[in-house]
Amino acid sequence: MEYIKTATEVYILKIIGGPASQLLASRTARALGTEPVLCEFNRFPDGELYLRIAEEIENEKVTLIQSTPTDSDFVALLQLIDACEGAAEINVVIPYMGYARQDKKFKSGEPVSARAIARCINADRVFTINIHEKSVLEHFPCPAENLDAAALIGSYVAGFGLERPMLVAPDEGARGLVKNVASGHGFDHDHLQKTRLSGDTVVIKTKNLDVTGRHVVLVDDMIATGGTMAESIRMLKSQGAIDVHLACVHPVLTRNAALRLFHAGVKDIIGTDTLEKAESKLSVAPLIAEALSGY
């Protein structure tokens, strides 16, 4: 894909994938009609990361794609940005941004970790995907844009062929995402509400709609430990749901989360490739490619 700056300057968009986002970078490059730039990644004997961009990128327009689920992945992103010194423009895509949930101080003496991370990104433009707290975008020292994968998830769910599926948010915070996923497909949607009956008895149920005899799709931006989702799955099935599917943007799925969810009775887990897991059945590459095409 070519970006024409002037009559004499033509830049070929260079897509560079970090170690955490190799597949996504390749898919994005293909969506843009190009090939990803080759990189070398290795470890020194003491465990430090070595990387090298194996193609010439000086005076080129480059886009780095790297999720940062671990500290090591964040360091790799910083190294990639530094290795691109001399490029005409550096765009950074952080599909999943670690520390984004630490967007404020909860106790005295704590850092605002999301702010600390964002301030380190020295680029011309940053893209995130369904970042947990949009306020984090204000901390980047450059223009930052949050992309929404809701429409991709909606189309994927529509492909299930379920009769009258109901989309459900596990809490108030996910209502906006669920509404956007349902938009354009006419899906019924609702959210779960906790009602405390006594000191130790809490009932979780949909606020407005009855799940009896319905195919339910629980939707959230991320699934981490799976504890809350597992509880929700059991409650929905006990209330008459035919089956329960899970769909999320970021399949973090720490430790035995997937096992916990299947033990609770989930039929399927669908995530995107913002994180490359076995559950990453849907690619956000078209979303990234479309965003990059606008610049």
From Swiss-Prot:
Residues that, per the record, bind D-ribose 5-phosphate: 196, 220
Keywords of this entry: ATP-binding, Cytoplasm, Kinase, Magnesium, Metal-binding, Nucleotide biosynthesis, Nucleotide-binding, Transferase
Active site (UniProt): 194
Alphabetical list of InterPro entries matching this protein: Pribosyltran_N, PRibTrfase_dom, PRTase-like, Rib-P_diPkinase, Rib-P_diPkinase_arc
Compartments (UniProt record): Cytoplasm
Residues involved in Mg(2+) 1 binding: 132
Cofactor note: Binds 2 Mg(2+) ions per subunit.
Superkingdom classification of source: Archaea
Cofactor (UniProt): Mg(2+)
GO process terms (BP): 5-phosphoribose 1-diphosphate biosynthetic process; purine nucleotide biosynthetic process
GO MF term set: ATP binding; kinase activity; magnesium ion binding; ribose phosphate diphosphokinase activity
Reactions catalysed according to its record: D-ribose 5-phosphate + ATP = 5-phospho-alpha-D-ribose 1-diphosphate + AMP + H(+)
Binding site for Mg(2+) 2: 171
Record's function text: Involved in the biosynthesis of the central metabolite phospho-alpha-D-ribosyl-1-pyrophosphate (PRPP) via the transfer of pyrophosphoryl group from ATP to 1-hydroxyl of ribose-5-phosphate (Rib-5-P).
HAMAP family according to UniProt: RibP_PPkinase_A
NCBIfam families to which the protein is assigned, alphabetical: PRK00934.1, ribP_PPkin
Name under which the protein is recorded: Ribose-phosphate pyrophosphokinase
